[in-house]
Each structure stands twice: as structure tokens, then as C-alpha cells.
Amino acid sequence: MSELAFAPEVVAASRDPLVRVIVGPNDDPQGAVSAVRVAATPARVWEIIRDVEAYPSRIHMIERCHVEGDRLTMRLAFRIALFTARFGYTARLAIDEGRSLEVRYESGEPRDLRLRFDVVPAPAGDATLLYVASGYDITTLGWLVKLFLKHHPEIRYGVYPGSSLALLDSIRRAAESPG
């Protein structure tokens, strides 16, 4: 998850976010990488990414977040019709200050969670390129997801890009907003 999925020049020139599905050895989706040009300085984008405990106020699927040293405890909440499905996990944070933040799964659900945020100055120096990579074991998201996957396995091709794009857009919006 550490190499950039798109050349910086391609991201900088694109008007819209870019996304790529990550497939496993059996051509099954396992995650996605997305990238976008952010109209904010790298320092501002990094400030938003680095403030992990503020994620619940910025990212709708995150209900609670606590960081102690390099250990992260997070609770996710997904509202589905009349009920809410909640999941929690612990992970380690790997930080390359000002450049990348990676969440490395330790325990809980969704299993095998991998998140990575990369901040790259735009080639023209007028913006920031934000890359978000995400992946997890989709089968650990409860009985409802298993039921949907049993009858519609093709939705895996949308769930992973949707997760990555939701994270990307939340960080972009926060970085571009005043304050």
C-alpha cells in the first residue's frame, strides 16, 4: 500500500477523483486506492489527516476514535434502514510526518483493515495531491453483508471504491473548508 497508484501529474490534471480497485490473486476485490487534487496546502491536508481523534466529526462512518501513543481504537457505525451495525477494531499507527499515515490492523472487525493516507505536493506547487488506500475483509461485516454478498457478489466491486472515496472526500472537504 505504499506506492502511489496514480502518477502525480495525472492526479493534478484530473478534475475528478481517480479510483482503482485492488484485486487479489484470484481476481477478487480486496480494497481500493483513490486520489484527488485538494485546493489546500500540504500542511493543511496533513493537519486534517494527523488529527485522528477528530475523524468522528469529519468522517460519517466513524463513531468513536481514541489514540494512545501509536495505538488506535476505533468504532465504526453503519446505519441501515431501522438499525445501526457497529464494529470496533484496534490498530497501530505508522506515521511518516507530513507525508503518510497508515493504520495497521491488530484486532477486531472488520478484520485485516488497512488504511493509508499519502500527501504529495502538486507538481505546480499550488495544491496537494491526496491518496487514500483502504482494504479489509468484507466478510467480517456481519450477517447482512454476508447475505448480500451471497446473492450479489458483484457489490464487492463497489464497496471498496466507495469506502476509499468516502474517506478521500471527507479529508478533502475538511482541508478545503475555512478554519
What do the predicted segments below correspond to?
Residues 33-36, 62-65, 87-94, 114-121, ...:
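Hydrophobic/aromatic beta-strand elements that line small-molecule binding cavities or substrate pockets
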Residues 25-28, 53-111, 162-179:
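Glycine-rich portal/gate segments that line the openings of hydrophobic small-molecule binding cavities
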Residues 39-43, 67-70, 92-99, 118-129:
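A short, structured loop/turn motif at beta-sheet edges
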Residues 105-159:
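Beta-strand/loop substructures that line and gate deep hydrophobic ligand-binding cavities in soluble
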